Amino acid sequence: YEIYLKKQPIPTKLRGVELKWRRAGMKIALCGIGTVGGGVVKVLAENQAQFQAKYKEDLVISHVLTRDPDKVDRLGLESAVFTDRVEDIYEADIDLVVEVMGGVDFAYQVIRQSLSQGRHVVTANKDLLALHIDELQALANEKGVSLLYEASVAGGIPIINGVQVGLAANQISGVMGILNGTTNYMLSHMTQDGWTYDHALSVAQEKGYAEADPTNDVGGFDAARKITLLSRLAYDTRVDFHQVSVKGIDTVDASDIAIAAQAGYTMKLLGKSTKTAAGIQVGVEPVLLPNAHPLSGVSEA
């Protein structure tokens, strides 16, 4: 990522993110238990002692919302935590709701209801957030709880917390980054190995990087949702996902890559936004970068 800063006086009060822990331990409702949900269970189990030592509290999964009770058993959780009724989540004494179901409509209902009940929420649902982040964040602020979504952008890179907290004393004028691993994998091999677009997409699908319908990735829409969220945080203002200019790599072919390479350039799909006196411009498009540019060397997924 590249984030452009303007010098700004340090504010008298920085806004951080803090979860309020209850003495009896934090009760967690896990909504969804697929690959991501299973990973959450594993992380909590492996690091329970560390959490307890640091926060003097236990983290307890008290409810798991899923249609398949066998998934609960396979992860070694007690069968009593299973429920297929979202009403059980709403009616229980829960501190934190972790939404890892995916989709938009039902997940939105669960998150909105949880926040309205004064519960902290963690989600990685960028599709939902790109559409509803302003409403949900306002509700979280009103109820005095946290809405956390670090994993929605850039996976393990703590870019959201970096913007919210680490750069809170700065005025950001621009953001640019490679925001989609699938397309970066494809472009990397089209550049380095001479793969055609169709072959690169086929391999990406075989490896599980791209879905059977790859439109979300190759069309640039996944990156567009991410740059929408980052831009909203960077400029502390509403950014309409539907107003983002989006162009993917689905029209790029091997000859485009070869011509760029001969001229000393590397093609990357970038999410970019800038803030000027005229307003905020946000977009996603393939860009030719000089080979010496730091982002040119970012390869694979």
Question: Which residues does each predicted region cover?
Answer:
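N-terminal glycine-/serine-/threonine-rich beta1-alpha1-beta2 phosphate-ribose binding loop
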Residues: 25-117
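Substrate-binding/catalytic subdomain of NAD(P)-dependent oxidoreductase enzymes
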Residues: 201-297, 301
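Structural motif
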Residues: 31, 99-101, 124, 131, ...
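Conserved anion/nucleotide-ligand pocket segment
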Residues: 165-225, 230
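Short, Lys/Arg-enriched N-terminal segments with co-localized hydrophobic residues
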Residues: 1-25
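A short hydrophobic/small-residue beta-strand
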Residues: 120-122
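Rossmann-fold NAD(P)-binding glycine/threonine-rich loop
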Residues: 108-113, 126-155, 160-163
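Short glycine-rich anion-binding loops that position phosphate/pyrophosphate groups of nucleotides
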Residues: 102-104, 180, 287-290
